[in-house]
């Protein structure tokens, strides 16, 4: 094949150009993400039950739906949370690889079975089923710069004018408004109702009857009488539109003809649908809408589309209102991708310099360098065909591939120059002769390296997604590299290399290259003597190898484990929790203190603070608060102002708050897998011990966790039990008084809850009508005495006649996990510890809890647990595949052993480098480790294959090994140094994505240094020892050519 293209160099150029063109076009179409879709697909069900407690929502809604969800294909786990404001969310998480559209259809079908069993009030509110991830993509805020609009005005504007276009934007999965639109609020006065012998039920019935839209038909509609000349639509009664119209609703006509209207017993006006949440941006009145990404959607494309949507809406904003993005996860995507691209360019430059240093021929260096853009651009084309994206994982793989892909070109160019020098052939003929010698070896080495990485492509789960990105990218680059080395590089050699006279290649050079060559040759001579000494004294070095293996095993056990390294995402969360039962006003005081500290004391780091009162990730309620903190760009912050340093300083300050618990935490590396770094676990009531016992177990767990030196910031992702007023109805007494239970329940729901009646029209938009008691009539238990129910005789009976109450405790938020009541706990490893060690400590503490209490990992912790169980199998498969490929390559079961034995020599260096830098054994480390294994095997192949052929030609094992080492030292050092320097930019990276770059670069550099330095001494030992052990015959007479050369070009 190579001969064909050597004779037709333009044909080779055309193929190379086509490959680059296809790759360039693919880059324009490839989506850009920080990570691929690592998180498993999730479907969320959202429901609201106005006026219901968390327990009521759980008993009447959550469990009904959960029981119907059983039997859905590929369902991994189901979690739910019920809140005291009547809201509820059930999240069904599926196995990685499940089609989210299919999952949503299956969930919807199961939900249809449950809907008729739900309370009527829930069905009236509607049930939302969305494809969504757990975290927010970004928050869009509206802030009143001049204070002319209140938070309620802004929230109404968002819901009325922005919510719909935002929800229609491609890629938006779900959203949450921090506030509510206007509703027609009817505030009942119980004294006036009693005065007119009316009840809340009467008012609701009258409003429902008189605020209606009637379809009145037509005059002259078909079929019509002959001769009909008129056709007109009849406009009947329509929905009310103003507070004045509602005040005129007729409630009662007295015997004397006087009328009682709604305005006589209630205050009517526009107000919020609910008042649970309020927001501020840098202390100014604001409202916001948090957007969640749809499963499988592109983050950058979605964020760009949302910004364009907002830009189109801005001309219609009220005066003094400005749109802001107080929380945005996409800048880190562009910054991290940009950083890796710079790393890629730096790697190419460093590899070029190393090649030029060793080849000492500018034309030869240019030839090898020209293969880089061809292979890299071609790889992008393969990524597009495979449905991948441009992300940090594929870009890291590109960086790792640079050192591999130039290696094939180096082998071709070096061998062509050797043939020209030894045989005096012109470039074209020398290239043909050279390619005949090395074609098989090029393919063989590519197969071995692919064997190391291909098993990664077949693993499942979120970890499997990460492995596949690396595996497919590197293997594709290597495949293209071999193709280019067989087609394009020979054509370049035949046309670009200058002819060499016989022996000219080895003539001494002057200047720097002469100095370098002389010193390198002296090193080669010393190396040759050292190898001879090792082969003459095998036992001490075999024992040293055994010690290296033991050290490798010890380091593996010692290095802490993790899933992914932490990253500075440029955003920080702060969560506020005031004592149970605290008012919103009390919580706002703490929120203000927190914001003041961040904007003043951390002004060099913090760009903006968006605070929310009434909501946090732990739950909703007046005792909850949240801050979304945007940091300044990475290039404006030093290491002392990283997100982790800020979180630590902020947490120390927040510990001084006496009236609240405030936690500052950074988001995880993969935002799709949760909202916080560290671990995520559910304590479960598997024994049915009840809420109180589960709460006791939770508190016991938190107490023990606080004493552990391994754990930090351990907190419940829920709310503490708070005071609740248990109202008991005496059914017998009520019956004796002639009061029905239905009237009692309806009166309570309307007066103390917020009862939805129907809808009205406000400025062309349909909004809701709510009836509720005025605030002064529902502030304390004594206010219940103000409310009356009419009995069968028409008499007004006070609640005090048949109801009594007592104070108790209950949870404002209830969680369930896989069908049982549960409590979520979040936390992080203490400084100096990894998430793997923290998870082991959590399991130890959970094992000491009372019987009936179990635990389950979720989110990123679930994925980390899964990845840890996969690592040994992946490692073993990779080594096995290498062995099998080598056995096929050499037609021998013994020779591959000499190559495989080099694996620990690379691993030990990766472990030492990772340990010295304080990094963890995570997914990136494992990818780097497997790459190191492949490269270490490649270096061993260069020596073993050459030694094997020399031995078959009649050399002794000893002489064959030494000669192979001497001849292959220079290319081994050159390719290894090129690879190491190509990865150096990863290890010294800073800014966005630096954690991942350090994790993968450190292990690879350490592994390659040890694999190169140690392998060149131990590989000949392995070759001789294994060959002797398996009975390789020594020649009868040693043949020592004067100028031994490796005719295979290896």
Curated annotation (Swiss-Prot):
Localisation per UniProt entry: Cell inner membrane
Pfam family, one: ACR_tran
NCBIfam families the record matches: 2A0602, RND_permease_1
UniProt keyword list: Antibiotic resistance, Cell inner membrane, Cell membrane, Membrane, Transmembrane, Transmembrane helix, Transport
Mode of membrane association: Multi-pass membrane protein
Protein name: Multidrug/solvent efflux pump membrane transporter MepB
UniProt-listed InterPro entries: AcrB_DN_DC_subdom (IPR027463), Acrflvin-R (IPR001036), MdtF-like (IPR004764)
GO cellular component terms listed in the entry, alphabetical order: plasma membrane
PANTHER family to which the protein is assigned, alphabetical: MULTIDRUG EFFLUX PUMP SUBUNIT ACRB-RELATED, PTHR32063
UniProt GO molecular function: efflux transmembrane transporter activity; xenobiotic transmembrane transporter activity
Keyword Cell inner membrane in record: yes
Gene3D superfamilies named in the record: Multidrug efflux transporter AcrB pore domain, Multidrug efflux transporter AcrB pore domain like, Multidrug efflux transporter AcrB TolC docking domain, DN and DC subdomains, Multidrug efflux transporter AcrB transmembrane domain
Transmembrane segments: 10-30, 339-359, 370-390, 393-413, 440-460, 472-492, 539-559, 871-891, 893-913, 923-943, 972-992, 1004-1024
Family: Belongs to the resistance-nodulation-cell division (RND) (TC 2.A.6) family.
UniProt key word DNA repair: no
Entry's Gene Ontology BP terms: response to antibiotic
Biological role stated in the UniProt entry: The inner membrane transporter component of an organic solvent and antibiotic efflux pump; confers resistance to toluene, hexane, p-xylene, ampicillin, penicillin G, erythromycin, novobiocin and tetracycline.
């Amino acid at each position: 094949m190579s001969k064909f293209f050597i004779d037709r160099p333009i044909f080779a150029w055309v193929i190379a150009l086509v490959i680059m063109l296809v790759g360039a076009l693919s880059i324009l179409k490839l989506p850009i993400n920080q990570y691929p879709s690592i998180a498993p697909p999730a479907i969320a069900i959202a429901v609201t039950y106005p006026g219901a407690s968390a327990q009521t929502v759980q008993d009447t809604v959550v469990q009904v739906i959960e029981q119907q969800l059983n039997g859905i294909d590929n369902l991994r786990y189901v979690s739910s949370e019920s809140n005291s404001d009547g809201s509820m969310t059930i999240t069904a998480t599926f196995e990685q690889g499940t089609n989210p559209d299919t999952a949503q259809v299956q969930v919807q079908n199961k939900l249809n079975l449950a809907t008729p069993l739900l309370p009527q009030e829930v069905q009236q509110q509607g049930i939302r089923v969305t494809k969504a991830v757990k975290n927010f993509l970004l928050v869009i805020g509206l802030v009143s710069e001049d204070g002319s609009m209140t938070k309620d005005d802004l929230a109404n504007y968002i819901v009325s004018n922005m919510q719909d276009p935002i929800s229609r934007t491609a890629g938006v999965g779900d959203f949450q408004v921090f506030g509510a639109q206007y509703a027609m609020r009817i505030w009942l006065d119980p004294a006036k109702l009693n005065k007119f012998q009316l009840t809340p039920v009467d008012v609701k019935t009258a409003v429902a009857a008189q605020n209606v839209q009637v379809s009145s038909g037509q005059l002259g509609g078909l079929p019509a009488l002959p001769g009909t000349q008129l056709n007109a639509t009849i406009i009947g009664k329509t929905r009310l539109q103003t507070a004045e119209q509602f005040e005129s609703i007729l409630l009662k006509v007295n015997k004397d003809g006087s009328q009682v209207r709604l305005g006589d017993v209630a205050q009517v006006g526009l107000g919020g649908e609910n008042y649970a949440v309020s927001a501020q941006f840098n202390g100014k009145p604001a409202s916001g809408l948090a957007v969640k990404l749809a499963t499988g959607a592109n983050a950058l494309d979605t964020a760009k589309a949302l910004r364009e949507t907002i830009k189109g809406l801005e001309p219609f904003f009220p005066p003094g209102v400005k749109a802001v993005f107080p929380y945005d996860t996409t800048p880190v995507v562009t910054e991290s991708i940009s950083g890796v691209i710079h790393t890629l360019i730096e790697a190419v430059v460093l590899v070029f310099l190393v090649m030029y240093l060793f080849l000492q021929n500018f034309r030869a260096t240019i030839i090898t360098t020209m293969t880089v853009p061809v292979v890299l651009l071609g790889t992008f084309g393969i990524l597009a065909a495979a449905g991948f994206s441009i992300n940090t994982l594929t870009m890291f793989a590109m960086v790792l591939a640079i050192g591999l892909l130039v290696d094939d070109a180096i082998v071709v160019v070096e061998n062509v120059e050797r043939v020209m020098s030894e045989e005096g052939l012109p470039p074209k003929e020398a290239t043909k002769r050279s390619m005949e010698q090395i074609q098989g070896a090029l393919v063989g080495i590519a197969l071995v390296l692919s064997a190391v990485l291909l098993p990664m492509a077949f693993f499942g789960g979120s970890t499997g997604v990460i492995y596949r990105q690396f595996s497919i990218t590197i293997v594709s680059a290597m495949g293209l590299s071999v193709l280019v080395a067989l087609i394009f590089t020979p054509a370049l050699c035949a046309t670009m290399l200058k002819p060499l006279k016989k022996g000219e290649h080895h003539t001494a050079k002057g200047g720097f290259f002469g100095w370098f060559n002389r010193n390198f040759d002296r090193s080669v001579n010393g190396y040759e003597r050292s190898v001879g000494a090792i082969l003459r004294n095998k036992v001490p070095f075999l024992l040293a190898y055994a010690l290296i293996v033991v050290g490798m095993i010890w380091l593996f056990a010692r290095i802490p484990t993790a899933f992914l390294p932490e990253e500075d995402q440029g955003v920080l969360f702060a969560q506020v929790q005031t004592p149970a039962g605290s008012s919103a006003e009390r919580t706002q005081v703490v929120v203000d203190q927190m914001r003041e500290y961040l904007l003043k004391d951390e002004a060099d780091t913090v760009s903006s603070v968006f605070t929310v009162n009434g909501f946090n990730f732990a739950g909703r309620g007046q005792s909850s608060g949240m801050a979304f903190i945007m940091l300044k760009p990475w290039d404006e912050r030093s290491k002392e102002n990283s997100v982790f340093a800020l979180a630590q300083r902020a947490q120390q300050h927040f510990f001084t708050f006496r009236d609240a618990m405030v936690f500052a935490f950074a988001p995880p590396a993969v935002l799709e897998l949760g909202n916080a770094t560290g671990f995520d676990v559910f304590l479960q009531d598997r024994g049915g011990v009840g809420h109180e016992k589960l709460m006791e177990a939770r508190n016991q767990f938190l107490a023990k966790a606080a004493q552990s030196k391994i754990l930090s910031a351990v907190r419940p992702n829920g709310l503490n039990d708070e005071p609740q007023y248990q109202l008991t109805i005496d059914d017998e007494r009520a019956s004796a008084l002639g009061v029905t239970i239905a009237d009692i329940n309806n009166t309570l729901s309307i007066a103390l809850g917020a009862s939805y009646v129907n809808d009205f029209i406000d400025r062309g938009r349909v909004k809701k009508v709510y009836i509720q008691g005025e605030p002064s009539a529902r502030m304390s238990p004594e206010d219940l005495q103000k409310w009356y129910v009419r009995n069968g005789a028409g008499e007004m009976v006070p609640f005090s006649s048949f109801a009594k109450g007592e104070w108790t405790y209950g949870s404002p938020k209830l969680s369930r996990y896989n069908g049982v009541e549960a409590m979520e706990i979040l936390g992080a490893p203490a400084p100096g510890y990894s998430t793997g060690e923290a998870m082991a400590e959590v399991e130890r503490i959970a094992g000491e809890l009372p019987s009936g209490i179990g635990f389950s990992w979720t989110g990123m912790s679930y994925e980390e647990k899964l990845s840890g169980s996969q690592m040994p199998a992946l490692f073993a498969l990779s080594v096995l595949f290498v062995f099998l490929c080598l056995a096929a390559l050499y037609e021998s079961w013994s020779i591959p052993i000499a190559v495989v034995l080099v694996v620990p020599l690379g691993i030990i260096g990766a472990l030492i480098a990772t340990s010295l830098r304080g990094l963890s054994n995570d997914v990136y480390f494992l990818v780097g480790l497997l790459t190191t294994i492949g490269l270490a095997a490649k270096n061993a192949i260069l020596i073993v294959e050459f030694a094997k052929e020399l031995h078959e030609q009649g050399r002794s094992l000893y002489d064959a090994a030494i000669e192979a080492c001497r001849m292959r030292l220079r290319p081994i050092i050159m390719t290894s140094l090129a690879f190491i320097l190509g990865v150096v930019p990863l290890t010294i990276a800073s800014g966005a994505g630096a954690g991942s770059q350090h994790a993968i670069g450190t292990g690879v550099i350490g592994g390659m240094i040890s694999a190169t330095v140690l392998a060149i001494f131990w590989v000949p030992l392995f070759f001789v020892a294994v060959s002797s052990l398996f009975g390789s015959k020594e020649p009868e007479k040693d043949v020592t050519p004067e100028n031994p050369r490796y005719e295979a070009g290896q």
